[in-house]
Amino acid sequence: MAIERTFSMIKPDATKRNLTGAITKMLEDAGLRVVASKRVWMSRREAEGFYAVHKDRPFFGELVEGMTSGPTVVQVLEGEGAILKNREIMGATNPANAAEGTIRKVHALSIGENSVHGSDAPETAAQEIKYWFSDTEIVG
């Protein structure tokens, strides 16, 4: 497998519960390396822009409200097969369906407060990384 980069987000429901370190440790223990990280408080405009792909979905308003309710940690992760590896360690979107030992099984409160987001493909990883980081902020 090739070394690749992916985007990872620790959502407000997790940062409010002081889980940033625990979640980052799970990612690093899975073999991923943090090459960029910053804590942001998303504006409504940023949340709507980042999640624009979901704008016509019934949960969009609730998603934007949740993402603007507290600080978020946005990160770029690097490693062999980073996109798939991150998806695996995050677990299923619905924590009730997530595998034991995954971030969502361990830390998520509900499907709406599922603690993390991660890119699902190389194209979305590139877009999501570019949304939050300049090239000079990524130090690998």
Swiss-Prot record:
Annotated catalytic residues: H117 (pros-phosphohistidine intermediate)
Annotated SUPFAM superfamilies: Nucleoside diphosphate kinase, NDK (SSF54919)
GO CC, any one term: cytoplasm
Required cofactor names: Mg(2+)
Cellular compartment(s): Cytoplasm
GO-annotated biological processes: CTP biosynthetic process; GTP biosynthetic process; UTP biosynthetic process
EC number(s) on file: 2.7.4.6
Keywords associated with the record: ATP-binding, Cytoplasm, Kinase, Magnesium, Metal-binding, Nucleotide metabolism, Nucleotide-binding, Phosphoprotein, Transferase
GO terms for MF: ATP binding; metal ion binding; nucleoside diphosphate kinase activity
Coiled-coil positions: none
Superkingdom: Bacteria
Enzyme class name: transferase
Main location: cytoplasm
Catalytic activity from the UniProt record: a 2'-deoxyribonucleoside 5'-diphosphate + ATP = a 2'-deoxyribonucleoside 5'-triphosphate + ADP; a ribonucleoside 5'-diphosphate + ATP = a ribonucleoside 5'-triphosphate + ADP
CDD domains: NDPk_I
Any one Pfam family match given in the protein's UniProt record, by short name: NDK
Residues holding ATP: K11, F59, R87, T93, R104, N114
Family the UniProt entry places it in: Belongs to the NDK family.
Quaternary state and interactors: Homotetramer.
Function field: Major role in the synthesis of nucleoside triphosphates other than ATP. The ATP gamma phosphate is transferred to the NDP beta phosphate via a ping-pong mechanism, using a phosphorylated active-site intermediate.
Xref: PANTHER family: NUCLEOSIDE DIPHOSPHATE KINASE (PTHR46161), NUCLEOSIDE DIPHOSPHATE KINASE DDB_G0292928-RELATED (PTHR46161:SF3)
NCBIfam families noted in UniProt: PRK00668.1
The protein's name: Nucleoside diphosphate kinase
